[in-house]
Every structure is written in structure tokens, then in C-alpha cells.
Amino acid sequence: MTAEIQQPPSQPPAQSSPMSAATDKHGGQPSVMESANCATKTKKTNAGIRRPEKPPYSYIALIVMAIQSSPTKRLTLSEIYQFLQSRFPFFRGSYQGWKNSVRHNLSLNECFIKLPKGLGRPGKGHYWTIDPASEFMFEEGSFRRRPRGFRRKCQALKPMYSMMNGLGFNHIPETYSFQGASGTIACPPNSLSLDSGIGMMNGHLPSNVDGMGLSGHPVSHIAANGGHSYMGSCTGSSGGDYSHHDSGSPLLGGGGVMEPHSVYSSPASAWAPSASTPYIKQQPLSPCNSAANPLSSSLSSHSLDQSYLHQNSHNTASELQGIPRYHSQSPSMNDRKEFVFSFNAMASSSMHSGSGSYYHQQVGYQDIKPCVM
């Protein structure tokens, strides 16, 4: 009995040894699992850490900043890398893709020039500098983005802008400008020709435009030979009456040549001085000789047996119905009306051009009309 009673306590140690070993094994497994979990946690924490923010500049601006920081205004590729890494924390991390961006911007952008490598210079790599023609993009530290060829396009468009600004009707060209120093109005003949730009308007304007006139400010009647003289030479006078034009004018004696009236020979309420007397009606012009001028039959609409004002009023009443009358205008507005209508009159009169002999006769004569300043 005693032996049977003593055996059970001896068995538990034998049984306890495998259990203890099992518990040791189970206790060792959690330690390995914990180490693996800790490793994954550290990886997750490392992956969750965000790298520094990228600088708020483009790569072009960063490269320019690096090159401008050098006293010689030139750097190699490795020196540009060093400048960016020392200046911005973003380029110090494990991410190395920014180096490719720097290389691509250096080689593909026209703002940077690769300088030839000097003789006897150790190492490899070329110096990079900024193109002098592109320095305006980065002046005063403002790194502004500009498309390729921006400067060349601006320089190419400058002449066109200046030409467009000079073609406004607010400015009369120099050939028709007022000469205030001498007190006269310069009206040089043959300054505008239909062959050099107005001839392309032939056939597009009605023939009755040359008789167009506004009330109180009639437009001059241009000669019907093609209008190679814009207006006769006009001299300004301080005041007084308009002189009569008698039929015995020496300009009308040979060949039946029509005299081109100047634009500024017509009366204007804004130009006429207060001390001057009203306009005196002109004498009727002498009719053209039909034998000397073969074009007299085709110029029925431009008959010379009527006075200047009578013909102007007749054309205005019969052909220009519905056109408003401008009774009071400023001198600048009158200038514009005369300038535009004179072009129309020249274009319409070019349709009546004929032989070359008639052209030579017209060029030889100039009509001198007194004008009121």
C-alpha cells in the first residue's frame, strides 16, 4: 500500500517535464511573433513618415538659383546637386528621382547653355550657365515661367504693333501734316498714288461718292483721271475772302484738263475765323474742249459747266438720301471726314481714267487754291 501510495507523486514530475517543455515551446513562439509584429510596425511607421515638401519653385527656377549663387555664374551638374541638397531638405531624402528632372531641364530648356570643357581641366562634366537672352525671365528674383521663343516672338511683333499704332485716323501722315511754323498747310501732289495701294479699291466703291459732301463742309471734287495728286498745294491765309475763279484760268487753257480742288479749299465752320467774310460763289468753270479731250463724252457725270457748290448740292440731293447732316463738328472730326472721303473720291475717280496723254497733262499742272487757317 505504501508503495502504491508513493508512486503517484513520482509520476507527476515525469509528466510535468513534457508539459513544461510544451509550455516552454509555446512561450518561445509568442516572443518570435512579437518580434515580427514589431518589425512590421516599424516598417509601417517608416512608410507612414512623409518626406519633406517639395520647394514651391520649378526645376528651372531652382537651377537658375543655383547658377546665380555662384560667383562665376556657372556650375557643373554635381555642384547644382550639392546646392539643392544644402538648401532644401526635400533633396536630402532617399528619393533620387529629382536628379533626373534636373538633368532633363538642363538639356531640354533653351535658358541654359552648356559651356565647352576647358583644356587640362580635371574630372568630367561641363559647366552650365544661363543664356543672356533669357535673363529677362529671372530679373529681380521673380522666377516667371515663359514659353519657348517668348522673347523672339515679342521682338518680331514690335514692328507690327508700332505700324498699327501709326495708322490711326487720329494722326494725319507726315505728307499731309500741318506746318505750323510757316503758317501754311502742306499738300504735296503725287504723294498718294493709286498704283501703290489705292488701286486695289477700284470697282468696289460707287461712282457717286466723289460728289459726296456734308452740309456746311463739302468734300472736294477730285479730278477724274485717276487722282495721282492727292490735293493741290494749299497756302494758308490769316483771313479774308475766297478769290473768284474766272473762266480764263491759265490752268484750263490747254487740253481741257480738270483742276483738282483741294480738300481744304471748301468752307468749314470750325476752321473759318470769325473775322472772315462768307464764301463767295465761284464762277462756272469753262467746259472742256471735246476735240482736244477724247474723254469728254465719258465724263458726263463730272460736267464742268456747273459751279462747284451747285454740283455738290445736286449730287447730295439726288444720290445721298438718308445720310445724316453734321452741322457742328470739332476740327478733328472734320479732319477725319475729309481724309476718308478723299480716299473714296480717289478710288471712284480712277474708274474714269483713260489714255496716257491725259495723265501726262494732268501731272504737269497743279492747282493753287487759297485756304483759311
From Swiss-Prot:
GO terms for cellular component: nucleus
Gene label: foxf1
Subcellular location: Nucleus
InterPro entries: Fork_head_dom (IPR001766), Forkhead_box_regulator (IPR051770), TF_fork_head_CS_1 (IPR018122), TF_fork_head_CS_2 (IPR030456), WH-like_DNA-bd_sf (IPR036388), WH_DNA-bd_sf (IPR036390)
PROSITE patterns hit by this protein: FORK_HEAD_1 (PS00657), FORK_HEAD_2 (PS00658), FORK_HEAD_3 (PS50039)
Sorted UniProt keywords: Developmental protein, Differentiation, DNA-binding, Nucleus, Transcription, Transcription regulation
Source organism: Xenopus tropicalis (Western clawed frog)
Region described as Disordered: 1-51, 236-255, 283-306
DNA-binding interval(s): 54-148
Official protein name in the record: Forkhead box protein F1
Main location: nucleus
UniProt GO BP: BMP signaling pathway; cell differentiation; embryonic digestive tract development; positive regulation of DNA-templated transcription; smooth muscle tissue development; sprouting angiogenesis
Example GO molecular function: DNA binding
Biological role: Probable transcription factor. Required for smooth muscle (visceral mesoderm) differentiation during gut development. Also required for normal proliferation of the lateral plate mesoderm. Acts as a downstream mediator of bmp4-signaling.
